[in-house]
Each structure stands twice: as structure tokens, then as C-alpha cells.
Curated annotation (Swiss-Prot):
It is an enzyme of class 4 (lyase). This is Indole-3-glycerol phosphate synthase. The keyword Amino-acid biosynthesis applies. GO terms for biological process: L-tryptophan biosynthetic process. One of its GO terms (molecular function) is phosphoribosylanthranilate isomerase activity. The keyword Flavoprotein does not apply. Gene3D superfamilies: Aldolase class I (3.20.20.70). CDD domains: IGPS (cd00331). Belongs to the TrpC family. Pfam families: IGPS. It catalyses: 1-(2-carboxyphenylamino)-1-deoxy-D-ribulose 5-phosphate + H(+) = (1S,2R)-1-C-(indol-3-yl)glycerol 3-phosphate + CO2 + H2O. Pathway: Amino-acid biosynthesis; L-tryptophan biosynthesis; L-tryptophan from chorismate: step 4/5. It comes from Rhodopseudomonas palustris (strain BisA53). Its EC number is 4.1.1.48.
Amino acid sequence: MSDILTRIEAYKREEIAAAKRARPIAELEVAAKTASPPRGFVAAIRRKLAEGDYALIAEIKKASPSKGLIRVDFDPPALAQAYQAGGAACLSVLTDTPSFQGHLDFMVAAREAVALPVLRKDFVYDTYQVVEARAHGADCILIIMAALDDATAKDIEDAAIDLGMDVLIEIHNHDELERALKLRSPMIGVNNRNLRTFDVTLATSEALAPLIPSERLMVGESGIFAPADLARLERVGIATFLVGESLMRQSDVTAATRALLARDAALRPTGTV
């Protein structure tokens, strides 16, 4: 398979250049300052964990490059409400259009429908996108270490923190973990999907989780479809999960979310994050 990440970067940089021409960053900065205040993405996750529950970042995703169209009856506000009713801690909304059929308007609509904090799920290459995310109400942004050099990752993180946002730092291998640990944000997501091939295995999280310092907040991403997958990752200390496709394919999203999160709390190992 071709290098998907390289293709995505090429069109994202064109998008960013066009967006800067259409709406100067000074204009976005004004909108960011007057936007609804950040809701505390990491804080919401920590509250769930403190209650002894799994913390779910539930994803609103219409399509993907590897699977094509995932959900036909795509209604972001209704899906957000279904996730909230099902016990999600936070939301993730795809805003990339060419590969995921997402849009910033979907994130805005989803956030307005619930009280949950929302992650703008996109490929971020420029601080302009961070300001753009906050101007549209995002509470958290994504830094993909595979897509950025260290200096750019730091600039993007600094911009997000300055705006009061949280950051999900995504890694896929040991080298990316070492680089991620140089950043300040506590939340590190282990993506079980290789973004250059789109191959998926939970063994990625199992290999990397023991190397992540205990003070960091670990998030398992991709390849999570059933309670057994959550239990498998919990055995290596991961109790926060980002799940999209498996829930997006269900007719009753609330029931599916509850079923995914259901388990005997007494069986949960102590001290997991």
C-alpha cells in the first residue's frame, strides 16, 4: 500500500495555505478568544478513571481511507448525544474532508449538542490549525508524532496550551514515544494502526505501554471492538480508549457504547490509568 500519510500531508498543506488566504490568523485569534471556554478534556478523563470506570473517547467518523463509508445515517449531534448517554467521557470528531468525509461544522454541531469535551481529530501541521480549532470550540487537538518534527510538534503544543486546550500526543513506535516524552502534555495515545500502511494490531499498545511513565495518561487507539479488547489493554495499564468505527457501525449507538464499557469493576486491577 502507498504511504498514506505522505499523501495526506500534501493535501493538508494545500488546505492550510488556502485557509490562511481565506481567513487570516488575526481574524481567527479574535474568534478563539470569544469562543466557548475549553471544557477540560484531560480533566473529564481523569474524573471517569477516579470513579473506577473506563474512560472512553468516543469518535464521530463518517468514513476512513481504509474502510470507505462507515455510517450512512450520519448525524453528528444525534451521535454525540448517543455517546454521552452511553457513558463516554469525551468526544473525538473527524474534521478532515478528503480522507474521512469530516468537517469542522460536524465538530461544532456535535459539541453544541452535549456537555462533553471535544477533540478536533485531524492532521495538524501548522499552528494556524490550532487557532482554527479553538475558534470553532475544540477543547483538545491531536499531535501525530509520525507526521511532525520535534520543533513543529512543540510549536503546536505551545499554541494549544496557550489557548487553554489539551493535547493528545499520538505515537506508534518507540522512537515516537521518546520524542513525545519531550513534550509537556500528559496524554499519550498509542495508535495500534500504522498510519503509513493502516495495518492494525493491539500488540503495539502491549509493547509500548510498559515504557510510558506512570504519570502520563495512556490512551489506546484503533483496533478496539469489544470488551475483551479493553480488558486486554487494561492488563498493560491502559484504561482510556479512543473508539470510533466499531461504534459507528451500530444501529443503537447508546446501547453499543454501554455494552463496550460494561464490566465488573471488582475485576479491574488497581492503579491503572
